[in-house]
């Protein structure tokens, strides 16, 4: 099992360790506050904030929590978070990118380096693996929002690079430069997306055996469970059997 669907499933496994809703909401609130602080507190005028709010809604985060996170930025009483990207190699030489928002750079770096080392991998310098990924925008819609043909036609017309449709929904990919315009065009036609964000999409994936795959999933679990970590991306694929086992 390769391609779009497994990449999506691997990236979205974070939902398993984020089952503790308070931890999930805390991470979402942190992104909302940072986005509002860096730009305008109006989601309609701030693409990053809008994406953060959409992500929060998709996780059923209460409206009050969302508004409180925005108000923290407006009030100026929020913590100062640094955006940091960590890059390294996990088990099997798999490339891993970690995006974090932290109020303590030393703590975050120490913890994340420890996770890599204990997994048999190593944390590298910025730029050590990101050249193997594309900074890409992804816009996701539920399957019932449009047929595969209608979504493909609309996406191409809007300037998207690629579309993947399945029973679980539609994933539209666009370059970093055209992403916002594509998202806006699709929203005008199909309504609000369930997700619209910039991601690190691997240019190619590496097939790993089940033993290595389990080690990689364990590393990703540790990373995703860290309070400072917002997103984790990796360029591997595993067998259908292991994917089903780890998702269950």
UniProtKB/Swiss-Prot annotation:
Its main location: cytoplasm. One of its GO terms (molecular function) is DNA binding. GO terms for biological process: regulation of DNA-templated transcription. The keyword Metal-binding does not apply. GO terms for cellular component: cytosol. It comes from the Bacteria. Pfam families: TACO1_YebC_N (PF20772), Transcrip_reg (PF01709). The keyword Glycosyltransferase does not apply. Keywords: Cytoplasm, DNA-binding, Transcription, Transcription regulation. SUPFAM superfamilies: YebC-like. InterPro entries: Integrase-like_N, TACO1_YebC-like_2nd/3rd_dom, TACO1_YebC_N, Transcrip_reg_TACO1-like, Transcrip_reg_TACO1-like_dom3, YebC-like. It is found in: Cytoplasm. Residues 1-22 are annotated as: Disordered. Belongs to the TACO1 family. NCBIfam families: PRK00110.1, PRK12378.1, YebC/PmpR family DNA-binding transcriptional regulator. This is Probable transcriptional regulatory protein RPB_4273. The lineage of its organism: Bacteria, Pseudomonadati, Pseudomonadota, Alphaproteobacteria, Hyphomicrobiales.
């Amino acid at each position: 099992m390769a391609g779009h669907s497994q990449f999506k499933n691997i990236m979205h496994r974070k939902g398993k360790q984020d089952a503790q809703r308070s931890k999930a909401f805390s991470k979402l609130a942190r992104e909302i506050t940072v986005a509002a602080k860096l730009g305008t507190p109006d989601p309609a005028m701030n693409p990053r904030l809008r994406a953060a709010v959409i992500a929060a809604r998709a996780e059923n985060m209460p409206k009050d929590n969302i508004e409180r996170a925005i108000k923290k930025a407006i009030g100026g009483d929020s913590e100062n978070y640094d955006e940091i990207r960590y890059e390294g190699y996990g088990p099997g030489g798999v490339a891993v990118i970690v995006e974090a928002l932290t109020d303590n750079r030393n703590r975050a770096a120490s913890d994340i380096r420890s996770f890599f080392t204990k997994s048999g991998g190593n944390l590298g310098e910025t730029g050590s693996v990101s050249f193997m990924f594309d900074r890409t925008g992804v816009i996701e819609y539920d399957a019932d929002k449009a047929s595969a043909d209608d979504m493909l036609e609309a996406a191409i017309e809007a300037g998207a690079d690629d579309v993947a449709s399945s029973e679980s929904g539609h994933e539209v990919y666009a370059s970093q430069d055209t992403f916002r315009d594509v998202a806006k065009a699709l929203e005008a036609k199909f309504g609000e997306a369930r997700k619209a964000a910039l991601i690190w999409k691997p240019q190619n994936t590496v097939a790993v055996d089940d033993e290595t795959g389990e080690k990689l999933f364990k590393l990703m679990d540790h990373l995703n469970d860290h309070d400072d970590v917002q997103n984790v991306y990796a360029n591997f694929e595993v067998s259908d059997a292991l994917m089903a086992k780890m998702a269950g």
